[in-house]
Amino acid sequence: MLDLNFVVQNLPSVIAKLEKRQQSFAYLNKLPLLAQQRKSLLLQIQNLRSQKNQSAKKVAQKANAKEDIALFLQENNFLRDDLQKLEQKLKLQEQEIFDILSITPNLPHDSLPIGTDDKDNKELYCEGQIRTFPFTPKDHVYLAEKLDILDFKRASKISGSGFVVCKGLGARLERALIQFMMDLHSKKGYQEIIPPYIINEKSMFATGQLPKFEDEVYKLYNSKNNWYLNPTAEVPTINLHREEIFKPGTLPIKYVSYTTAFRQEAGSAGKDTRGIFRQHQFNKVELIQFCHPQNSYEYLEQMLKDSEEILKLLKLPYRVVLLSTGDLGFSMSKTYDLEVFLPSYNCYREIGSISNSCDFQARRANIKMKNPKNNKNEYVHILNGSGLAVGRTVIAILENYQNQDGTITVPEILQSYLGTDIIK
């Protein structure tokens, strides 16, 4: 969430920056008047409280002196009623301000290319060699069904479209990737986390999923607790420290979190809905970091390298892309996408994102640090990154490591995890 005072004091530049996202933010022009009215109400309330306190003292003094207090009680009651009306008016005023700020996204970083969507993203560099096949490569669905390691038909019978059953070496490959990713990131100083998969409304708001993206998540409607299914490990892991203040010397704090994620994926169509590229339920390893504001962009670059190492060790060809302002996520100031080459698409497709939300999510979640220089509480910066999306990594392995006979060579780094060098 953006800071009200910052927005009001810098309104023209804030709107100009936000409109690089190719949306209109004219509604923010309401904020200066609302902020002024709020300030005026606060002063009136402060004055009335002072008058009410003075009136209460008079009542007490008159009562102690055995004098008639009827008129003073009446005055006190009038002041009480006026105060309640003003407090209610202030509550409505603050709710209107809150509602405006809660639907306003983060400011995009100045380094981002200006654009309308992913077509305007900027390729930074490519890594790895794209394989030249001596045969026509098959897609992951064909390969997996022939090997009987992914079962879409029975998953559809159980749950409907957008789900899969992993079987045999398919299940072992999924599990091996999760363990490999968790092991690698743990060695780099990330603490392992397996959080709850059911999340409350406050947690969803804190990371920016609510209220804007309610249609994209699953809500448990039979619950009295406003529970949601986890849409990404970012949500529960960041909320570990909601309403907390970090002591001096404790930052940065780094987590690697494994969860199953659940998303509606409404509006998805075409080739992306075939197979496991875009599922309602999928496994994901996520990196989260809480850090000092001065270091957040330095740590963003390191987190990118940490995620890249997974692809390098798996020897998968990939590229790094800087998201344009029009493709940038709601809560993020800057995002890199990792895109792996998929032969069936004959192009690079997203396998992970690494982002800096600066203090945007920290404000929504009220996560602060104690600054030892001035002993004041300040908002931390929060980074998150994929480390990686497991299902899409499975796709990349099946397609890039396929053989002409339909078998799959297991990447060398995974062979000890999987207990075999080939899937057949």
From Swiss-Prot:
EC code(s) of this entry:
6.1.1.11
Query: PROSITE patterns in the record, alphabetically?
Result: AA_TRNA_LIGASE_II
Q: Which domain of life is it from?
A: Bacteria
What are the entry keywords?
A: Aminoacyl-tRNA synthetase, ATP-binding, Cytoplasm, Ligase, Nucleotide-binding, Protein biosynthesis
Q: Which Pfam families match?
A: Seryl_tRNA_N (PF02403), tRNA-synt_2b (PF00587)
Q: What class of enzyme is it?
A: ligase
Pathway-wise, it operates in:
Aminoacyl-tRNA biosynthesis; selenocysteinyl-tRNA(Sec) biosynthesis; L-seryl-tRNA(Sec) from L-serine and tRNA(Sec): step 1/1
Q: Which reaction is catalysed here? A: tRNA(Ser) + L-serine + ATP = L-seryl-tRNA(Ser) + AMP + diphosphate + H(+); tRNA(Sec) + L-serine + ATP = L-seryl-tRNA(Sec) + AMP + diphosphate + H(+)
Q: Name one GO molecular function term.
A: ATP binding
Q: Which InterPro entries match?
A: aa-tRNA-synt_IIb, aa-tRNA-synth_II, aa-tRNA-synth_II/BPL/LPL, Ser-tRNA-ligase_type_1, Ser-tRNA-synth_1_N, SerRS_1_N_sf, SerRS_core, tRNA-bd_arm
Name the residues that bind ATP: R263, Q264, E265, E350, I351, G352, S353
Give the main localization category: cytoplasm
Q: Per the record, GO CC terms? A: cytoplasm
Give the quaternary structure.
Answer: Homodimer. The tRNA molecule binds across the dimer.
UniProt remark on domains: Consists of two distinct domains, a catalytic core and a N-terminal extension that is involved in tRNA binding.
Q: Which family, according to the similarity comment?
A: Belongs to the class-II aminoacyl-tRNA synthetase family. Type-1 seryl-tRNA synthetase subfamily.
Q: What is this protein called?
A: Serine--tRNA ligase
Gene that produces this protein = serS
